[in-house]
């Protein structure tokens, strides 16, 4: 991950900062809401893991409340319609997969892609966050690694039967991540978050997850290439 110095020149009360923050804050709130709903739906597909998935969902709901408090602390109203549109692609793909009972695709979208995206965003945000948001985000990111681990472990245990669907789901959903990164880069930069750092941190987390599941380095490079044209 590119080394980031803590920057102190931010005026967290400026209109420029608060305008960008209204969208970034909304994105993280909506991301946690998506995660909450997704884990509850996955509990329907994996009744044997219902207790664990419900626990993960409750954690995501707590995260959402924490990020709502971050917005309140800066007196910013999150632009939730913007955030809902931001997640529309992944949301639609998850709901389609859920309706067809495709648990592998659901796990890839939520437990790998969305979690790795969140980890990247939070890691890059922490050094440049205001003091209140930094404390909240540091606590959240620790939880997200455990959520990523849940998806890894389930998919690793079922790798032989899940591999083909994982490759197809990656092909369909990874390009959406690059579209999302491109869409958010202007606002992220105002907050001190560089797109290149977000991309690198995401690929580290996502690539490590794919490796832990059972994909070879060559396979991971091929799977990662589906998004490179959009970076």
From Swiss-Prot:
SUPFAM superfamilies reported for this sequence: Ferritin-like (SSF47240)
Keyword Zinc-finger: no
Keywords: Iron, Lyase, Metal-binding, NADP
Effect of deleting the gene: Abolishes the presence of alkanes.
Single Gene Ontology MF annotation: aldehyde oxygenase (deformylating) activity
Gene3D superfamilies: 1.20.1260.10
EC category name: lyase
Swiss-Prot/TrEMBL catalytic activity: a long-chain fatty aldehyde + 2 NADPH + O2 + H(+) = a long-chain alkane + formate + 2 NADP(+) + H2O
CDD domains noted in UniProt: Ferritin_like
InterPro entries on file: Ald_deCOase, Ferritin-like, Ferritin-like_SF
Binding site for Fe cation 2: 60, 115, 147
Cofactor note: Binds 2 metal cations per subunit. The catalytic dinuclear metal-binding site could be either a di-iron or a manganese-iron cofactor.
Domain of life, per lineage: Bacteria
Amino acids binding Fe cation 1: 32, 60, 63
Keyword Transmembrane annotated: no
EC number of this enzyme: 4.1.99.5
Function description: Catalyzes the decarbonylation of fatty aldehydes to alkanes. Requires the presence of ferredoxin, ferredoxin reductase and NADPH for in vitro decarbonylase activity. Involved in the biosynthesis of alkanes, mainly heptadecane and pentadecane.
Protein family membership: Belongs to the aldehyde decarbonylase family.
Name the record gives this protein: Aldehyde decarbonylase
Source organism (scientific name): Synechocystis sp. (strain ATCC 27184 / PCC 6803 / Kazusa)
